């Protein structure tokens, strides 16, 4: 662990807030993984010059509704997201019906994992 990220008791200290999100636009890059960083939770900076940090290449090739969590036993970070893409034809395929999408659309979640919030695994579907 880098000393600047650890407090005097050897615990990780807070450096910034990480916002994991997608963009609500029906284009292939809109339904991907974006990061925002903030020191105070009010003023945010885009990561990766506003481009997606991670891409969904499997399943519906788009993701929404993220959650990020950290496992206590191994310290790894995980991003979970709904496997859903409106940009790749979900609206046409399911007649613009959220009911049809929810009943007949993908039943998967996309998952990425990281030891450090910088380097991420390949997407996998669960």
Question: Residues of each region from the PLM?
Answer:
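Carbohydrate-active catalytic/glycan-binding domains of CAZyme proteins
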Residues: 1-126
């Amino acid at each position: 662990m880098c000393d600047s990220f650890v407090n005097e008791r050897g615990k990780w200290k807070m450096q910034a807030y990480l916002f994991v999100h997608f963009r609500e636009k029906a284009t292939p890059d809109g339904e991907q993984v974006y990061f925002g960083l903030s020191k105070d939770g009010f003023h945010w900076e885009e990561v990766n010059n506003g481009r997606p940090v991670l891409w969904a290449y499997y399943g519906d090739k788009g993701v929404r509704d993220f959650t990020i969590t950290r496992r206590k036993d191994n310290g790894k970070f995980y991003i979970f997201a709904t496997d859903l893409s409106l940009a790749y034809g979900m609206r046409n395929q399911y007649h613009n019906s959220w009911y049809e999408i929810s009943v007949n659309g993908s039943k998967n979640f996309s998952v990425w994992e990281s030891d450090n919030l910088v380097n991420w695994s390949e997407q996998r579907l669960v």
